[in-house]
Amino acid sequence: MNTTPDTALLVVNLGTPESPTAPAVRRYLAEFLSDRRVVAIPPLFWKPLLYGVILPIRGPKSAEKYAKVWLPEGSPLAVYTRRLAGGLQAVMPDWHVEWAMRYGEPALRKTLDRLRARGIKRIVVLPLYPQYSTTTTASIQDVVDAWRTSAPEIAVEVIQDYCEDTGWVAAIAESIRAHWQVHGRSEKLMFSFHGLPQRVADAGDPYPQQCERSAQAIVAALGLGADEWQMGYQSRFGAERWLQPYAEPTLWKLAEGGVRSFDLVCPGFATDCLETLEEVALGFSETLAERGATLSYIPCLNASDAHAHALAAMARRA
């Protein structure tokens, strides 16, 4: 009897450099920032700016930041995504589980090719973006749709979002409670989501509404009052207006108004990465300390059992 799974779950994260070095970071950023879903400027104008100005400057600077959070096993985002895939495989023995990156390695299209070579008949693609955006989830959808033309015999579903999924919300809420039990509870809980250019939201991207729905669902699960939490957006890039309120200035204003301690969680990130570990856990903590306040960072769900069980349940329902 053949017991080899013919259904696969493919979890896809954003991507990461292969090492915390300027050349590796430049290669990664070149691929990431060349995606028209990410930067909509026509290539004729964008490429000279990207290769002539942005990569030479950001490559070394970003490499220094990656070096601060790099793990012995590699990039935090890759390490935790790989471990999460292993946890999913453990709770889904009747499925084959793989992981891939939209940018960098393991490349999404190559991973889809490997699944086809294994004889997989059905693939559920789960982008590790709880909230949908045309700049993230849709980019994965683009790659999958292009690949489908070469593999019409394989059924493929792409999960679009899980911003209010009950299992995921419960896992986030429980991770916050567990953090409070160990570290104590601060005066205010901050939800920090990755930012997005305001023009993208104005064009109809549902991301900000989904971020708000995620925060509200977690707040409801925790039973918090309106004065006990705040949300904002981080990781702004460039000079144009992004979604507001900006997370870090919001924290500063609250600190200057008398709030002395904050807990902070990033529900838009499935796994910890540069933006959560270096920008938030280190950077926000430093600037708040200058204002007489403290920040206690609550890690992402990463490869926790609760995370694996929540995602597995989503995949089985797809």
Swiss-Prot record:
Q: Does the keyword Metal-binding apply?
A: yes
Q: Name one GO molecular function term.
A: ferrochelatase activity
Q: Can you say where in the cell this protein is located?
A: Cytoplasm
Q: Which Gene3D superfamilies match?
A: 3.40.50.1400
The alphabetical list of record keywords is: Cytoplasm, Heme biosynthesis, Iron, Lyase, Metal-binding, Porphyrin biosynthesis
InterPro entries reported in the protein's UniProt record: Ferrochelatase, Ferrochelatase_AS, Ferrochelatase_C, Ferrochelatase_N
Q: Which GO terms describe its cellular component?
A: cytoplasm
Q: What is its EC number?
A: 4.98.1.1
Share an example GO biological-process annotation for this protein: heme biosynthetic process
Q: Which HAMAP family does this UniProt record tie to the protein?
A: Ferrochelatase
| Record family assignment | Belongs to the ferrochelatase family.
What is the stated purpose of this protein? Answer: Catalyzes the ferrous insertion into protoporphyrin IX.
**Protein name, please?**
Ferrochelatase
Species the sequence originates in? Xanthomonas axonopodis pv. citri (strain 306)
The opening ranks of the lineage are: Bacteria, Pseudomonadati, Pseudomonadota, Gammaproteobacteria, Lysobacterales
- What's the encoding gene here? hemH
